[in-house]
């Protein structure tokens, strides 16, 4: 089945809404060390929001407008994405209010006014998204003479997330 870049992007946003965890790192900081972070969104596109703590090493090392890279794997390993963008600390109270939920609240003793609460915003610019077909199916196709490179070419796309 052929997939357009737009279809792959839609699959990415849908998978992110259900799985939420990705690995987030700053370009050129700590040799690109990435941390698992829970992404929250407000629709079918970015930005990606992350609740964290002011004592998180990423927050402490974050100059405003830092280049960031995130890696995402859907829970069933059927979709992968490498996301690039700009990461900002953005403690916007209106956004905190909109995104606040019981799972976030569990991390902050002081609630929305906890002095350790920090909110990060990833303005995603582009991503490379891969759909992963069943490796068993790929093996069967190869036995039947199907070129796996040709079969896979419509399952990867570079998409603009702005």
Where are the predicted features?
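Positively charged, polar, low-complexity stretches
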Residues: 11, 30-36, 59
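C-terminal edge-of-domain segments
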Residues: 113-162
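Short, structured beta-strand-loop surface elements
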Residues: 58-124
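A short, Trp-centered hydrophobic/proline-enriched beta-strand micro-motif
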Residues: 14-29, 67-72
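Short His-Asn-centered micro-motif
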Residues: 51-53
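Short active-site oxyanion
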Residues: 44-49
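N-terminal leader/targeting segments and the immediate start of mature chains
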Residues: 1-21, 162
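Short beta-strands and strand-coil junctions in structured, solvent-facing domains, enriched
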Residues: 57-58, 129
